[in-house]
Every structure is written in C-alpha cells, then in structure tokens.
Amino acid sequence: MSELRDKLQSLLARQGLMSGAEWRRKTEELAQRRASGEFEIDRVVSGEVVGDANAGFFLVRTEFPLDTAHGNVTLGEALLALPEHVALSANDADLRDFAPETAIFLDTETTGLAGGSGTVAFLVGAGYFDGAVFRLEQAFMRDFDDEEPMLRYLDGLFTGRDAVVTYNGKSFDIPLLRTRFIQNRMPFRLDAA
C-alpha cells in the first residue's frame, strides 16, 4: 500500500497538484488571509475611498506633467494635434473639431466580455487634460454596491467633455457604461460627446 501511496505522491508532485489535505490547508490559510484584510486594495495601492462606509468606491488619482514622455512624444504634444489630421487618421469627418483639452480618455475593465445587463465595469480609468497636467483617475468597485456612487462620480468627470477617446469604446466601453447608467437610473452624458 505504501508503494501505491508513494507513486501517487510522485505523480501529484510531478504534475504540480496537491493532495486533499494540502488543498484543505491552503484553502483555510487563504480564507484567514482574506479575513485579515490582507488583500484589500487600499493595502496594495495608494488611493482613497469616495462615498460612505456602506457604498463607497476606491479612487486612485495620478497627475502627469505635460512634459512627461511616452516614447518620443510628450503628453503636452497631444494638445498640438491638428483636428483635421485627427479626422484624417481616424477616417472620421466628425473629428474635424476635435480638441484634446476638452476630451476624456476612457478605458474599462469588466466582469466579462459578453456585454449586456449582467456585465459590470469594476474599474474605469478616465484621463483628461487640466491646465499644466494630465490627470488620470481610476475608479475601482470593491463590491457591487459601489457601482452607483462610482457612476455618480464619473458623471461629474463627463460633464463638459466634448469628445471621448477610447480603444474599443464605440463598440464596447460606451455601450457598457450606457447600460450601467440606465440600470442605475442616471442620465448618460457621453451620448452627447
């Protein structure tokens, strides 16, 4: 019998698998670590809770001076982009009046890629020019009841924005955010941008 047990242990080790007892021990250890708060975002990332104790999202704010370089280009150089060049490169005549200083740059991380009413944007990154800096704000839902205060905050960021810049926002990010705003009975300002 011990020969069979030794073979099983060897096979488990070779495949990187755990025995039932090891699995149970690791699961209990992980549960204790979670209960201690070790994995709470505020212990890993500098930021603040916005809202109240019952429903407040986690916000990380970062400012980048306009002389911050990305490759060979500084952030400030984006403000020099000619609208007609932007429209031509995007093959979109509607961008002939594009002004980076009034745009909001968005990206979302979601609970799934299917879209629809069950998909939630648990992390929304929003960047915008503000005087001599480019501000990046990352709003993170720690739980589902954080969504409404996070959307209210984002609504304030969207106010006064003339354009939205995203990677795949027209087909994913914007429809997803629109759905979340509607489900929370809030107007979606980006439809006008």
What are these regions (language model features)?
Residues 114-132, 136-142:
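RNase H-like nuclease fold core
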Residues 131-193:
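Conserved DEDDh/DEDDy metal-dependent 3′-5′ exonuclease domain
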Residues 70-72, 114-119, 176-177:
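Short, conserved acidic/polar surface loops in the N-terminal third of protein domains
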